[in-house]
């Protein structure tokens, strides 16, 4: 418990690797009921990837995810932990150099032949250069060739990985739902049907109940007068409000917002922020990736600053934003003013 608030989500040592790129580096975060957590940081810092890992839209490479006492995901060690990355990177760089060298050599002879087709020896050179290039291409560097399989197998025996099945994934995503930057609405359907469909697919609600709930939340976000409009007839701000209503309609415990205002025209930003402020005042738990520093400072009860796949600083919004400790956060904030 934190200030008598219930711990509902515990994220421990979440990491995400793409080949040699480590997008997330062992991130941990506890989320309590009623929290409004603003995640800030420069582009490419891993914020959106982290958000997608929280409800397993993106499967982490390792780490654990515990929602209301139930572990939905847990991998303590992964293959990447047993790969000799130094040797792999060195050999991969050599491979790239060789690939470029043989490709350039082939291009030189091909260009010479275009300029002077009378030189019959060029055909032979082209054939040999293409063979050399193809030979390199056939033998790409595979990082699994650098895996210490013996140590990895020992680790597997000692570990007890937990990977959710489809039923558990749907269960988790109905409780931790995402509002996407791109809205993810169906343009060929009207507003009301968009909100109804999500309930029928995820919660298996009957049409009458789903319609009643949809109207309730569309009214909450002040879209009751646009229920019969098609999505492509709406402004960006209106689309985002529909996306929020759709998320609320499946009764989630936590709503994840991925830069909810970044795709909007400036005059539409305030209408979406007002809806989010209202949700915060009603105690809805939210995790928001945002560039809106006023929202982070004045609405959130916790700010998390991410950079290069790490949580660099976190804490009370006014303290973090007004008195940044790290040079990286100081530099970031200086560019947002």
Where are these regions (language model features)?
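A short, proline-enriched helix->beta-strand linker immediately N-terminal to the Walker B motif
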Residues: 249-253
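Helix-to-loop junction immediately C-terminal to a conserved catalytic motif
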Residues: 55
